[in-house]
Regions:
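Glycine-rich oxoanion-binding loops at beta->alpha junctions
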Residues: 1-14
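Hydrophobic/aromatic ligand-binding patch that stacks against planar heteroaromatic rings
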Residues: 7, 34, 51-52
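Glycine/threonine-rich flexible loop motifs
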Residues: 21-30
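The substrate-binding groove and active-site-proximal loops of carbohydrate-active enzymes
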Residues: 16-22, 160-161
Length: 168
């Protein structure tokens, strides 16, 4: 988290994963409850029902160790349903940057992997550059190699069925 705890009171939704904030971080949880008092939706993702779960609108009891699959499913849903703030994505992230032709992701490994050194040649992931040396951008997000579309393709494997099979 990069904001001050007090700023949580301004949230529309709060997602708590793997923390019993009500018991272990009561001062921080005070600000979460202020957000709820103002209408925010509180979600708690944790295998164990706790005092935090009891105060939230939703408790999602995952199988232990599957939170990354759950988050991947959330990312996929947000991307597929276009539930993101497009102006923010275009102007404040690298989503529109076009990745070079050497980039690939196959069999669980990114391009540039050297099994002998067990390390990556990160130059394989470089952005395409324009004549001025700056990364090329596709603000339409239609280029199949822009970061946004590569991310959509990567997270598409986190379907509702796959995620629910893994997380329980």
């Amino acid at each position: 988290m990069t904001n001050h705890w007090i700023d949580i009171k301004n949230a529309d939704a709060v997602l708590i994963i793997g923390s019993n904030a009500a018991e272990h971080h009561p001062v921080a949880f005070k600000w979460i409850m202020r957000a709820k008092d103002k209408g925010a939706v509180l979600m708690h993702v944790d295998p164990k029902f706790s005092r935090t779960s009891a105060r939230c609108d939703f408790h999602v009891p995952l199988r232990s160790g599957t939170d990354i699959a759950f988050l991947g499913g959330m990312v996929n849903y947000i991307l597929q349903s276009e539930s993101y703030f497009k102006d923010y994505v275009l102007n404040y992230t690298n989503a529109a940057f076009v990745v070079g032709k050497d980039y690939a992701f196959e069999d669980g490994l990114f391009s540039g992997y050297d099994p002998k050194t067990r390390s990556y040649d990160r130059s394989k992931w470089a952005f395409e550059k324009g004549p001025d040396g700056a990364p090329l951008r596709d603000v339409s997000l239609r280029n199949e190699r822009c970061v946004f579309n590569l991310m959509k393709r990567h997270y598409s494997r986190y379907s509702l069925k796959n995620v629910s099979d893994v997380t329980g």
